[in-house]
Amino acid sequence: PGPTLHVRQGTEVVVNAANDTDLETTVHWHGLRLDNRFDGTHHTQDPIETGGAFGYRISFPDPGVYWYHPHIRQDYGQEMGLYGTIVVEPTDPHYWPPVNREITLTLDDILLTDGAVAPFSRTRTTHTAMGRFGDVLLVNGEPDLTLAAHAGEVVRLYLVNTANTRVFNVAIPGARIKLVAGDSGRYEREEFVQSDVLAPTERVV
């Protein structure tokens, strides 16, 4: 996946997206409230042709976790790793409950054939929904990512399901999980859970 972007609430940036792939594309800023002409979805802009570029003016009015990805041929683009997360840090220092540290995790899967990414159709999307089920699970692009925490340490996890089709059921055996936010921001009531189910494109904190 691409890099995690950390920005302050209220910031505005310009992202110059260059298309070096062999298919037309756009960049969609998933969950962000912004000017429609920069949203990157179908019919809000012309596709970025191969070798072309487009400048996106992006605002970040709300704290939370978001992500960016293609909105043309998502099945191809996302499977090839064209996505990344965005963490919008709140201006209110008390917006989030206190923690010792933060980690951003993208959940994905990929379909391999003979050790390589299974081929795609160039003319139509392949398999279920807008993508296909993979046979290798990935966290931050890694098939065997290992993380460690100290006893008593409180870690804020920004979780994003970037898979085309797969639903993930996330649990951490031996640790307490508290849900504090989702797609629409901070929850009014925090809740301890044994696990949490994330549908494709869903985000939780």
Where are these regions (language model features)?
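A long-range scaffold signal marking pre-active-site subdomains of enzyme folds
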Residues: 1-32, 100, 163
